[in-house]
């Protein structure tokens, strides 16, 4: 019982501390007074902004919008099998009629059944190659069902062409995805013809001799982003959440709900008996071990950002004049929290996750922001 009660107390104390800090900044700005700790900077014209060399203790990783001459090498473990340059895509059998299709950056799933093929997602980057992949694994068969993982164009933007070439195809999605697509009015993303509702409420899709379980775990990457499980092949597909072997795309892949994102990742390995994970991106499939690795990284990131927020002093190193600018004080504070976060996780993770250096600043920025406005995710 004591363990269950400790987290709310920590959360309240953490949020109270941040609220007091924000109020102090705003009051100082309104009153026109500094927060102390001013140091002399370079000489600047009073009519324009200027900036100094980087902060103290800057990581040896280039910060955002600074040109990088050479990125860290991609570990061999993060690379998938080579793509045939002539075909421009590859198909990987996952067993029991399930197949991965990828051009190296995006992924789709095919499930071959007695009467046709179930297609999960239709990334425009793969485009017409999807139809060639269907013909390769199921000659003469049509796509009978198209399942949308979620509403984003980069994952289902070729759905309109799939619908045209497969008349009568059943398009399935969560009702939250339907709402987003109805608002978008995009002919390249036809509205679902069948939907399901609810959170943590499994929905079964049967096609010929195959069946899939669809479930919306709750807010994560985007409202309506679902888990697709094919029990026969022990394949789980969840898009834009787990990136096997790689750093997540920028800002947790632009997750709209970070606490929900954390909970979704945390639940996967205990919830599903799977051996193969399709994350929707890059050129290899994942495993339960990949999920555990990403969760461990997320845990370290969470701790590093929280520690940075708690130990970084507001206004330190700023001129007295700039400390009357509430936005500037907080920008400076967040910069230094981010530097603390990056420095904390780099030694352990920079050689374990591909593209760590590409998006580590983005992840720290998202994490500190979520901690400030959502509270702890762990």
Task: Report each predicted region and the residues it spans.
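Metallo-beta-lactamase
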Residues: 176-224, 231-232, 262-266, 272
